[in-house]
Amino acid sequence: MIDIKLLEKKAETGTSYYDEYKQGLVNRGASTEVLEQIMELNKKRKELITQAETAKASQNKLSGEIGKIKREGGDASAILAEVDVLKTQVKELEAKAAEADQQVTNLALVIPNKPHSSVPVGSSEKDNKEIKVVGTPTQFSFKAKEHWELGEALNIIDFERAGKTTGTRFAFLKGAAAQMERALIQFMMDKHSMKHGYTEMIPPFMVNSNSLLGTGNFPKFKEDVFHLEGSDLYLIPTAEVPVTNYYNNEILDEKDLPQSFCAYSPCFRSEAGSAGRDTKGLIRQHQFDKVELMVFAHPDKSHEVHEALTSHAEQILMDLELPFRRVLLCTGDMGFGSAKTYDLEVWLPGQNAYREISSCSNFEDFQARRANIRFRSAGGKPQFVHTLNGSALAVGRTLVAILENYQREDGSVGIPKALQPYMGGRTEIRK
């Protein structure tokens, strides 16, 4: 959420933060109308507060005169009537100011974050900037199959029966695919906790609406989540939501920053707006597993932490020997709450394309302001932390990448060396 007070101040460049934020919205391809409405409403709110304070001061002054008049035996009825009028005015003005304040808050909740200055300006994924390529895209002497063809041929993925029991965008993993999914989760969690020092966490798989508001999913993306009817509970779209809200409305000690967590969870998404996209296979499911990295960082260190977090996600791909690239998203392709995002895209030979397998973002204080997560230095005032998170990795898409990159001409699939100890020493998948 944006800092309304900051919008009224001058930036170090000499321009106002309002102008900078407005330009940030333009760079995102977002409307600036709401920002302008916020400024007008905030101006109105201040005027109403001033009027209420003036009326209150007059009321207090007259109230003081009433006692004097009564002590002198005079008639204070006229002043009493005037005080009653002022009391009514104060209540009305304060109510209008509170209403304007709520309107400002409601509007502020639907404005996206301001992009960091290092983010390239662009309108779509074609304007994203390739940062690096790791590994050579896998090429075969035979026609590469897509993962769903391999999964069905090996009898380890069943989409048809999932469609019968549940519906579209679901799958049964069985045999070697189920074993590999479980092995990947364990492998990723071990790597992040044992090598990189993240604290393991398994969060609740349901959250309340306040938590979704804190991360920026609500109110703008309410249609993207599954709601448990008759309650204030929602299935999580990502572990980012419960883990970010772990410190909701708390003040941390500066010396305890950064705090880093790795969390496994299933994720549930309605995929509203994705009609016709990736309708076959595991790429876009209503339910999928993911390992998430989450860091609460000092504002002075957050962009340094962002680089480290992204490299930790990359390490999983390198250990599995999967070709990938890192892409810096442009302003028009970033998520709503992000100030800067790197996507990791893994090579899929069956599609002959790079596909997203991880998104690593620095939200700066955008989420912390919404969820009221702060830290305090010794003797200092509370400040908002910076929050960062990244998929490390989307487990189903990692399974997809292994099937497609390790496929063989005879229809079998090899298992990455790093994963073999997690699969009982198994080296391949055959029917």
From Swiss-Prot:
Enzyme class: ligase
A GO MF label: serine-tRNA ligase activity
UniProt xrefs under PROSITE patterns: AA_TRNA_LIGASE_II (PS50862)
Major localisation: cytoplasm
Binding annotation for ATP: 269-271, 356-359
A Gene Ontology biological process term: seryl-tRNA aminoacylation
SUPFAM superfamilies assigned to the protein according to its UniProt record, in alphabetical order: Class II aaRS and biotin synthetases, tRNA-binding arm
One Gene Ontology term, aspect cellular component: cytoplasm
Pathway field: Aminoacyl-tRNA biosynthesis; selenocysteinyl-tRNA(Sec) biosynthesis; L-seryl-tRNA(Sec) from L-serine and tRNA(Sec): step 1/1
Annotated Gene3D superfamilies: Bira Bifunctional Protein, Domain 2, Serine-tRNA synthetase, tRNA binding domain
Reaction(s) the record says it catalyses: tRNA(Ser) + L-serine + ATP = L-seryl-tRNA(Ser) + AMP + diphosphate + H(+); tRNA(Sec) + L-serine + ATP = L-seryl-tRNA(Sec) + AMP + diphosphate + H(+)
Pfam families recorded: Seryl_tRNA_N, tRNA-synt_2b
Subcellular location: Cytoplasm
EC nos: 6.1.1.11
Keywords: Aminoacyl-tRNA synthetase, ATP-binding, Cytoplasm, Ligase, Nucleotide-binding, Protein biosynthesis
Subunit architecture: Homodimer. The tRNA molecule binds across the dimer.
Entry-linked PANTHER family: SERINE--TRNA LIGASE (PTHR43697:SF1), SERYL-TRNA SYNTHETASE (PTHR43697)
Family from the record: Belongs to the class-II aminoacyl-tRNA synthetase family. Type-1 seryl-tRNA synthetase subfamily.
Domain notes: Consists of two distinct domains, a catalytic core and a N-terminal extension that is involved in tRNA binding.
Function of the molecule: Catalyzes the attachment of serine to tRNA(Ser). Is also able to aminoacylate tRNA(Sec) with serine, to form the misacylated tRNA L-seryl-tRNA(Sec), which will be further converted into selenocysteinyl-tRNA(Sec).
Protein name: Serine--tRNA ligase
Taxonomic source organism: Bdellovibrio bacteriovorus (strain ATCC 15356 / DSM 50701 / NCIMB 9529 / HD100)
